[in-house]
């Protein structure tokens, strides 16, 4: 079992635990008299498996632990306050008290809604996650950020509150789709660009490229399961280290936003375009992050942060070999509004994270218009 401890505050702590199967987490749930399971309908099989295990233990031990469950459709359009209120209404209807545990099983949308609802219901309910996508295992479920979208803007409303547990389960890699894998791989590469301990960036590019070039990509993911788990744990470890030193994102934690200012603007523009045209050209968060990092790499060279004139091209070539997009489908000017409303904007300046080299990033405060002008000229 791999265990990482993140100190949350003087009263609580948050643990990341790697367990073999989803039923192995039951031993960590013994102290909770009631468990409320919120799960993505697409991973119903995992939720059912866990609930059945808890009920089996109840039957053999005579325990009276009760389990209630609530299925949600985990789509970006559902990542809003209405969904959070639905969960709170369900908890209230079931008379959930503050001794209970809210357990979210699913990807980043599910963990965000779980954490947000638990943060505000009765001023705080204990909660835990079973992230079922690579992206949520290495990023979304770690660190205590719980956010939902508002007026199409990404994660505009939210809380910072740590889950008591994050259970990382390799079993979920057996059923992960290739698109989800690609989305998660972008967040892993982002993490290793920030901190390239043990040359994990190069290792990740090699494994992801082999999977992408395979004729049967889904089978290839399973074939490289051992290597992927090592990379997942490494990425989770890096993020946990950073969060433990800067819970409220006052300094070092901002590094984890590499590519995200551009990514959130691209996601916002994609959502807006779909609403205007009735289209369904959805860009996943990981795909947008890959594009955002590529733009950040170009910008880093243009303003002299990165002295290596080949770095941006090398990163983009690496990303393409891993099956990731590197070019934005939208004109830079169309991203201005979303970037100005980004959470990282203060006094008209955005905290951009730029790349000095693989393993070293820096923060630079820049005006949105200046950045977009540079990007436009570089096209």
Question: For each predicted feature, which ranges?
Answer:
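ATP/NTP phosphate-donor binding region
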Residues: 1-101
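C-terminal charged capping/lid subdomain of soluble metabolic enzymes
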Residues: 186-188, 305-379
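Active-site segments that bind and position negatively charged phosphate/pyrophosphate groups
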Residues: 213-333
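Hydrophobic/aromatic beta-strand patches that form the interior of the parallel beta-sheet core
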Residues: 68-70, 103, 128-130, 165-168, ...
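A glycine/threonine-rich phosphate-anchoring loop and its flanking beta-alpha core
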Residues: 9, 116-211
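Short glycine/serine/threonine-rich phosphate/pyrophosphate-binding segments
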Residues: 109-116, 137, 264-265
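Glycine-rich beta-strand-to-loop/alpha-helix junction loops that act as flexible
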Residues: 74-75, 105-107, 258-259
């Amino acid at each position: 079992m791999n265990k990482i401890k993140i100190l949350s505050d003087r009263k609580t702590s948050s643990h990341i635990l790697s367990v073999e199967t989803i039923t192995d987490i039951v031993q960590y749930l013994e102290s909770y008299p009631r468990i409320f399971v919120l799960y993505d309908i697409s991973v119903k099989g995992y939720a059912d498996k866990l609930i059945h295990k808890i009920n089996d233990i109840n039957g053999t031990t005579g325990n009276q632990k009760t389990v209630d469950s609530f299925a949600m459709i985990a789509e970006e359009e559902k990542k809003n306050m209405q969904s959070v209120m639905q969960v709170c209404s369900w908890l209230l209807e079931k008379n959930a008290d503050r001794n209970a545990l809210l357990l979210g099983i699913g990807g980043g949308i599910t963990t965000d809604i779980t954490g947000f609802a638990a943060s505000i219901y009765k001023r705080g309910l204990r909660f835990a996650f079973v992230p079922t996508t690579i992206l949520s295992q290495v990023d979304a479920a770690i660190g205590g950020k719980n956010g939902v979208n508002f007026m199409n803007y990404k994660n505009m409303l939210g809380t910072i509150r740590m889950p008591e547990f994050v259970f990382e389960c390799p079993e979920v890699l057996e059923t992960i789709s290739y698109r989800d894998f690609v989305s998660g791989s972008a967040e892993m590469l982002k993490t290793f660009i920030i901190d390239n301990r043990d040359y994990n960036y190069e290792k990740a590019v090699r494994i992801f490229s082999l999977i992408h070039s395979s004729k049967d990509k889904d089978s290839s993911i399973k074939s490289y399961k051992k290597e992927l788990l090592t990379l997942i744990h490494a990425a989770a470890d890096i993020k946990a280290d950073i969060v433990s030193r800067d819970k409220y994102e006052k300094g070092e934690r901002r590094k984890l936003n590499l590519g995200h200012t551009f990514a959130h603007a691209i996601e916002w523009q994609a959502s807006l375009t779909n609403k205007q045209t009735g289209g369904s050209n959805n860009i996943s968060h990981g795909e947008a992050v890959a594009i955002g990092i590529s733009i950040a790499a170009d910008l880093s060279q243009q303003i002299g942060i990165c002295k290596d004139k080949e770095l941006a091209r090398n990163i983009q070539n690496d990303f393409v070999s891993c099956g990731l997009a590197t070019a934005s489908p939208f004109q830079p000017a169309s991203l201005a509004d979303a970037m100005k409303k980004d959470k990282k904007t203060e006094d008209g300046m955005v905290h951009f994270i730029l790349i000095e080299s693989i393993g070293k990033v820096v923060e630079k405060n820049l005006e949105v218009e200046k950045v977009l002008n540079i990007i436009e000229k570089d096209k």
